[in-house]
Amino acid sequence: MNPMTFTVLLATIMSGTSIVLLSSHWFMTWLGFEMNMMAIIPVLMKKYNPRSMEAATKYFLTQATASMILVLAIIINTMYSGQWTIMNMENQLASILITLALVMKLGLAPFHFWVPEVTQGVSLDSGLILLTWQKIAPLSLLYQIYPSLNTNLLLTMSLLSIMIGGWGGLNQTQLRKIMAYSSIAHMGWMIAIMTYNPNLSLLNLIIYITMTSSMFMLLIINSTTSTLSLSLTWNKTPIVTTMMLISLLSLGGLPPLTGFMPKWMIIQELTKNNSLILPTLMSILALLNLFFYMRLAYSTTLTMFPTTNNTKLSWQFKNTNILPTTAPLISISTMILPLTPLLITLN
């Protein structure tokens, strides 16, 4: 793809998300979603092959369906309230429809089927945009309308997402699918706390984007897309592979890494609201995610596969595509757990 075209598309994607973030009118919000969707489809097809075309088509059909449901909900809400203001959600049916539309855009269960397939069909850098930046706009809209959301519906979908995100990743060997199921599980944690403490959900989103971005950047540096190629990276880039191990454990939520912080704060907040069964189930289901992160960590750095002497002398060209943001992102995604008391105080 032409670099100028790619830059224009990225600017359009960011503009669409910014419109959703800044608008208080339903029509402008819908327009921002459509701008975002139409700009990211060529980005998904950056490497032109049948897999990427199939992934872009699946993404388009899912997002278009979600947009139609969103427009229907907006019309119903406007008919009942007589206003186009986002904060004015008076109709319960409109609220449920908007929730379903945004959940479909986010890829939460039971509307999660497109996420692993689309992520697997695109390149690593397109997958990075898909699993990080594309989550901002729907979550920001949920953040704006959280007082009128159906708590039971959100909690059911969040628990289902955490369970499917754990079970789905257990038998995967493709790293992009594993990251997709990881994204589904993390979205479940964010949605669970949305109606209780939306600021905590926002903090969870920031930490999730940081951890996922650092993991994808490390995968891009090593050009690895499967567990087999991941197991051979230690001979080539031991330092990068060690950073990958730490990032994986942080994604799994092991203390004393950053990923433990949002889980800790969400469980604490749910417990404060006299909800004990839900955080217990969420904690148990999170062990499924931790298992396949540990499996990746084990095959990456904790063991050496039987190899011939030739592969132990592997070499590769110096990677010139390392972004300057990689090191700060890795630092943030692994070492800010000591700031938790400060964040609890601010919260």
Swiss-Prot record:
Its main location: mitochondrion. GO terms for biological process: mitochondrial electron transport, NADH to ubiquinone; mitochondrial respiratory chain complex I assembly. The keyword Hydrolase does not apply. InterPro entries: Complex_I_Subunit_2 (IPR050175), NADH_DH_su2_C (IPR010933), NADH_UbQ_OxRdtase_chain2 (IPR003917), ND/Mrp_TM (IPR001750). It catalyses: a ubiquinone + NADH + 5 H(+)(in) = a ubiquinol + NAD(+) + 4 H(+)(out). The chain crosses the membrane at residues 3-23, 25-45, 59-79, 96-116, 127-147, 149-169, 178-198, 201-221, 239-259, 274-294, 326-346. It is a multi-pass membrane protein. Belongs to the complex I subunit 2 family. This is NADH-ubiquinone oxidoreductase chain 2. It comes from Sylvisorex ollula. The gene is MT-ND2.
